[in-house]
A protein has these predicted regions:
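Non-catalytic structural scaffold of enzyme domains
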Residues: 1-202
Length: 202
C-alpha cells in the first residue's frame, strides 16, 4: 500500500461491563459468546472480511462463537505462539487476568505448537488481577505494582521461561520489554500486526 494508506477498519465495542457480568458471576462463556456474535454480525454488515478481538480473556468463549460466526477470527494466543516460535522462545510465562491465566486459552494453543508454558501461582494470579482491574483499567500505575509484576516475571525466569506473555491489553501500560526481566510478548500488538498482514495478504 502507498503513503498514508491502510486497510479499512471497522470497530464494534460492547461495554466491558456487559462482558464482565457473566464472567464474574460464573454464568459461563455462552453469554459472552452471544455478545461476540452480536458484534460479528454487526461487523459483517459493515463489510468486514475477518475479525479480531484484543481482549485475551474472552477468547475462552471462541469455541462457542466459531461454529456460528459469519466471519473467520484470528486467535490472539495462536498469533502469540507464532511470534514466540519466530523468535525462538520455548517456554512462556503467562500473565493476564485471573480468568485468563487459570483457563485454557493459551495452554491449548501453545501445546498444539509444542511450546511449554507456566502459570503464575494462585496468589500471583489474584494480585495481578487486582492490579489490572483496580489500577490499570482506571489509568493508574504505581511503583509498587510495577515492582510486584517484575517479581512475577522474575519468578518465571528462575523457573526456566525465556519470555513472558503480556496477556492483557493493559499490562503494557505497566511494563515494557526494556523494563521486563524477560523478553515480553505484547499480545495486543502481536495480534494487530497479524491482522495487518492478514488484511494485506487478502
Amino acid at each position: 500500500m502507498g503513503r498514508h494508506a491502510h486497510p479499512e477498519l471497522t470497530m464494534h465495542t460492547i461495554s466491558l461491563a456487559e462482558y464482565m457480568k457473566p464472567i464474574e458471576s460464573g454464568a459461563g462463556w455462552k453469554p459472552v459468546a452471544e455478545l461476540m456474535l452480536r458484534s460479528a454480525e454487526t461487523l459483517k454488515r459493515a463489510g468486514a472480511d475477518f475479525l479480531i478481538c484484543p481482549d485475551n480473556t474472552i477468547h475462552e468463549a471462541l469455541p462457542f462463537v466459531l461454529p456460528r460466526s459469519p466471519l473467520p477470527w484470528l486467535h490472539i494466543a495462536e498469533e502469540v505462539g507464532k511470534e514466540a516460535k519466530r523468535r525462538g522462545f520455548r517456554k512462556l510465562g503467562i500473565t493476564g487476568t485471573k480468568f485468563l491465566v487459570s483457563g485454557p486459552v493459551y495452554p491449548e494453543k501453545l501445546e498444539q505448537m509444542g511450546i511449554a508454558y507456566l502459570r503464575p501461582t494462585r496468589e500471583q494470579q489474584e494480585q495481578v488481577n487486582t492490579i489490572i482491574f483496580d489500577e490499570l483499567v482506571r489509568g493508574q500505575q504505581t511503583p509498587e505494582s510495577l515492582f510486584y509484576f517484575e517479581q512475577v516475571i522474575e519468578s518465571f525466569k528462575i523457573q526456566g521461561c525465556d519470555a513472558v506473555v503480556l496477556g492483557c491489553t493493559e499490562l503494557p501500560l505497566l511494563v515494557n520489554e526494556n523494563e521486563s526481566p524477560l523478553p515480553a510478548l505484547d499480545s495486543t500488538r502481536t495480534l494487530a500486526r497479524a491482522a495487518l498482514q492478514h488484511a494485506l495478504a487478502g
